[in-house]
Amino acid sequence: SSDSVVVHTYSASCMEKIMTVKENKVLKFDKATMQPFLEKMFTGFFAVIDSEEFGENEYVMKATMRALSVVKEDVVAITELVLNKLTGALGRVCKNPKNPQYNHYLFESIAVLVRSVCSSQPSATTAFESLLFPPFQTILQMEVTEFIPYVFQVLAQLLEFKVDEIGTSYSTIFVPLLTPTLWESKGNVPALTRLLIAYMNKLGPAHPLITPNLMGILGVFQKRLSSKANEIFAFSLIGSILSHPDGYSAVEA
């Protein structure tokens, strides 16, 4: 509630460090300890994050990420509040990305929230998708290059947890994921590979979305295999195909 950015910064930095302290390899401030303070803590963080006056404070966003990492699934009770605030912040930074550290912790906060909530409640992916897809589509359409790897990372997470049909949003972006220019950026390769594997694990090579594009996927595999730095991603990708009962026949065809 202070009007001082310096107070915000040092308070957030202190809290973030406190949340990493361990005793006998166990967090001294675990999720049970944090539970009574969750709503008040996040309300304080987001009062700063929402404010145009205070700017993008990476220390506050890092503390937000750390708190989400510590409380894990206990954040479920205030998921709507946290997700709305994070997507609001995402919408603002998309217009003018200027603080890489802040942006990194923002996306990591979203990723931690997805993992914490959807690992215990897979059906929650629908709520996440409804709020995250609009800014994600904006990022991809506007080619905000510094954000694209993060978008692919979170999309892969959501798809991994998803229990129902993938829907048109995932179907629409699948073919563009095979575009060679996307794979030319080294920063995109790990997240893109994870996302393609998520599709393969979810649908299988015989799925109507996958089968017509299998040659494109194999092209991605061959290109990654030609690079020593990327061959691990190539083997992960081909492994996701061959792990299916119809994987070998699909590749041979």
What name fits each language-model region?
Residues 1-253:
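Karyopherin-beta/Importin-beta family HEAT-repeat alpha-solenoid scaffold
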